[in-house]
Amino acid sequence: VPGQLPLPFRTARRRTLAAVLGAGLLAAALAAPAGATGGDGRRGGGGGGPTTSVEPFGATPDGTAVERWTLSHGDTTMRVLTYGGVIQTLEVPDGAGEVGNVVLGFADLAGYLSEDDPYFGSLIGRYGNRIAEGRFTLDGTTHQLPVNDGPNTLHGGPGGFSERVWTATDVSDDEAAALQLVLVSADGDQGFPGTLTTTVTYRLEAPSRLTVHYQATTDAPTVVNLTQHTYWNLAGEGSGDVYDHELRLDASGYTPVDETLIPTGEVAPVDGTPFDFREPTPIGERIRQADQQILFGQGYDHNWALDRADDGAREGSDSEDALEQAAVLHDPASGRTLTISTTEPGIQFYSGNFLDGTLVGTGGGVYRQGDGLALETQHFPDSPNQPDFPSTELRPGEVYDSTTVFEITS
């Protein structure tokens, strides 16, 4: 395609089965954490070592119990649900030392069980982002998935990993409060082939560093694309829109989409477009431009192809060895800065276009358009149908291995 950029192929995320998932430590504390709120006015500086606690958090309609875990380290506190692996709250200090929640979410389980939940804080699988017409062919066999986003399948379809109860184990150590989440997805689940065993580890280190490590194995060829769908507002949950946040993306290209938000197959240069975030740019600066891609997404809802080093040198390396910076988000008002590093070749920037004032958040206010944004590290949308995109295939004897680090400073 004229003007098209080369694709940053990435295969280092798959390792042989000899590098199997690490076993976790079994220790679950039972102290009940504080309730989920927005900014609480606490001042940072006290700190402390890593701690975890767990409490009941209701049950799904079929009676499956849900837990809420609280992970704390230093001035940072994170609450995680076993339902969907949801990051419900993440409390960190701002530039003045005031501690506040910087992610969007619901105060109770009912919000996450609702069909209106826009994947707040959820783990996404089996396949993050969209697959065209819910259909792909693997090794000569065509697989049909249920569709849930117009004609397409989004985030694994109805009943995806964001709607499952994961098994949680405390795997904390002296350096981090850590939680391991495990989910087994049977052959044919969501229409995907192969029994997939997925392990996701949240590791909270001081000061305000969260590592998300994904691993998965399969007993039959399949496709996998896992991500985390946290909505960020560095000024504080419920504080208004994020249009003054300044975003930098380490990407010279992005994947344009059609009217149903399926990539055309091209990786187009960002130069001269509203998609050029190679220098820090306020999110609201160009979001109202009459660009056809902006119109398709009603704002930003696109995948950027990250500028990566030569991947050939990374074959067989551990996931964390291949980490590279992907994005930097800064809020001038609070002084908070979020830096994202990842082993993935792409990142989806979604500017909260479909928040419509009908959802009540953890702080008691409603979320309107642009009140939060998602930065989802990933392989590319619709890769199973796009032979020129980095492969998302996973086969028996391989391990899906991906790491993303979120670090907040102020």
Which sequence ranges carry the predicted segments?
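Secretory targeting and sorting signals
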Residues: P2-A36
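Basic polycationic patches enriched in arginine
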Residues: R10-R15, R42-R43, R314
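An exposed, glycine/acidic-rich loop-and-rim segment of catalytic or binding clefts
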Residues: T37, R43-S410
